[in-house]
Amino acid sequence: MEERLQKLLSAAGLCSRRSAEDYIEAGRVTVNGQIAKLGDKADLSRDRVALDGVEIGPAAEPVYLMLNKPRGYVTTLSDEEGRPTVAQLVADCGVRVWPVGRLDLDSEGLLLLTNDGALTHRLIHPSHEVEKQYLVLVSGDMEAALPVLNGPMELDGVALAPAQVDRLGPNLLSFRIHEGKNRQIRRMCQQVGLTVKALRRVREGQVQLGGLKLGKWRYLTEEEVALLKAL
């Protein structure tokens, strides 16, 4: 059955439909060796569709994983500097999956991985405001910092969406945010004079890390997948 190229590229897990439109307009997509244009359709059972010369096949069976990422691993599939990657930790799943969003090199905890391009786009797009929770071990004056962390803040001159920050212990904070700016929590803490000693993501949406051991992964349950798709 013929389908629009942007739908085929997204279903193959290569990009979102919006990104696929940009790739088509840039001349990076071909059908049977001919440069495609917006509005073109193809049938993968008979047509050869390629992005940047790499041919795509029929959509793979969707796979959804949860990894408890250790510190020291980059949230990429490969690294030019030769650092350990999260892809190495889930290689035994037997399917090519990619991270949903990112988790800093020095951070640990819940990281979702999938080959579902549509769900990836939904979870990382700011308009969906998916809440994430982090446990953060800090040093510094927490009493003075808490009101500021819960109030209006900026990074690089841009206002942040409100965060919910609660004190759980003498040096332990819970951050609930639905943005994912680069090193956001560490930079927020730095602004209020706190030093981050450890940072762990424990929840994304309603999916929780639970007791999964550090460096291990598991498949999401059907219920967890449904919760993510409902966001």
Descriptions of predicted regions:
Residues 1-231:
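Basic, flexible Lys/Arg- and Gly-enriched helix-loop patches that mediate nucleic-acid binding at interfaces
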